């Protein structure tokens, strides 16, 4: 359905027949769609890949006798059968909607998914556009859920945007609590088509992205977040979907105020500056920030964002002083005038700048 609706949206604008090569198998993990070499380079699949090499001699006899109940979920299977044979066909690009079967393996997913994109481009000999869908919300809503595996997988997907000629359409706001495959495929396809129409087919007037976090600053109990374009708050009067990490490492719900059309302040009932802020970080998040073209602001976490400016206050770094300031690596002052001997005592695990030195807290 998604591929059909995507093609239909392109046809409305291009007014020419759209060719779609549908190569998909439900319930498969990302590693099923990459080459042996890519899976081996990413790591984590050694036992299966070694078995492949050992069984190659007797492969036909083994498969005829018992292919295995979950053979379609094995590394490289769909790649070998459903992707590699297509490499002789010229294509304009690829769209991808997958990830549910990799939830829980979020750290591995980032290099795996990037490897897939590079792998496919290599065998086609073409740096074609690769547009993909960020997973929809799923399961029962939880207001403060920093350990969400679904949110972590979405973040791993988002990291693929670091590759050239990629784009992501989020489905985070069209999910259903009890259906891992939500029915609103038309909206997801529309968002994918906006990416293709603007970046592949040259419709430069199309808005294909929501506002992005441009800068932030942390002060006592408060974060101020500035976005790249005006925001629209839907459903209720105030922004929602934010959680804050307190100086003790605990996460709490953030109370939000819209300062102007592109700036939000988030506050909490704790003492000190927050360590980080996350937006739409849950299995089934309820964030309500949108931009033009009804596109939702993507989930984010300030503690893992490159290229976003943060306000760094004047920090005491002189190691000869009796006290020092303690700062996170993304510039948040978490302690002022702390004694050298106990500067990081009680802080969450991570790397901090204590005075003029980096310190690892375990």
Predicted regions and their residues:
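C-terminal outer-membrane/trafficking sorting elements
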Residues: 309-362
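Cell-envelope and extracellular/periplasmic
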Residues: 1-308
């Amino acid at each position: 359905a998604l591929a059909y609706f995507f093609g239909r949206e392109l046809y409305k604008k291009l007014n020419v027949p759209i060719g779609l090569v549908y190569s998909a198998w439900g319930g498969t993990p990302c590693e099923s769609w990459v080459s042996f070499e890519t899976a081996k380079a990413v790591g984590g699949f050694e036992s299966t890949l070694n078995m492949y090499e050992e069984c190659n001699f007797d492969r036909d006899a083994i498969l005829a006798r018992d292919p295995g109940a979950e053979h379609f979920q094995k590394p490289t299977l769909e790649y070998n059968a459903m992707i590699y044979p297509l490499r002789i066909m010229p294509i304009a690009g690829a769209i991808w909607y997958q990830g549910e079967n990799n939830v829980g393996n979020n750290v591995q997913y980032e290099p795996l998914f990037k490897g897939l994109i590079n792998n496919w481009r290599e065998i086609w000999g073409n740096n074609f556009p690769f547009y993909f869908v960020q997973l929809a919300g799923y399961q029962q809503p939880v207001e403060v859920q920093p350990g969400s595996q679904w949110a972590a997988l979405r973040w791993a997907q988002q990291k693929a945007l670091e590759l050239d000629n990629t784009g992501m359409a989020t489905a985070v706001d069209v999910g259903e609590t009890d259906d891992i495959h939500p029915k609103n495929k038309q909206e997801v396809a529309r968002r994918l088509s906006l990416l293709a129409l603007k970046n592949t087919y040259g419709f430069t007037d199309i808005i294909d992205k929501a506002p992005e976090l441009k800068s932030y600053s942390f002060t006592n109990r408060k974060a101020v977040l500035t976005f790249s374009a005006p925001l629209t708050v839907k459903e209720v009067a105030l922004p929602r979907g934010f959680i804050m990490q307190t100086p003790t490492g605990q996460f709490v719900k953030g109370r939000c105020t819209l300062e102007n059309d592109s700036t939000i302040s988030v506050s909490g009932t704790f003492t000190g500056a927050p360590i980080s802020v996350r937006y739409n970080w849950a299995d089934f998040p309820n964030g309500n920030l949108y931009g033009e073209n009804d596109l939702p602001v993507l989930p984010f976490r300030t503690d893992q964002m490159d290229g976003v400016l943060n306000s760094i206050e004047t920090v005491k770094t002189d190691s000869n002083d009796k006290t020092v300031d303690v700062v996170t690596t993304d510039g948040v002052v978490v302690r002022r005038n702390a004694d050298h001997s106990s500067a990081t005592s009680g802080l969450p695990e991570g790397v901090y700048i204590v005075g003029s030195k980096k310190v690892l807290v375990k």
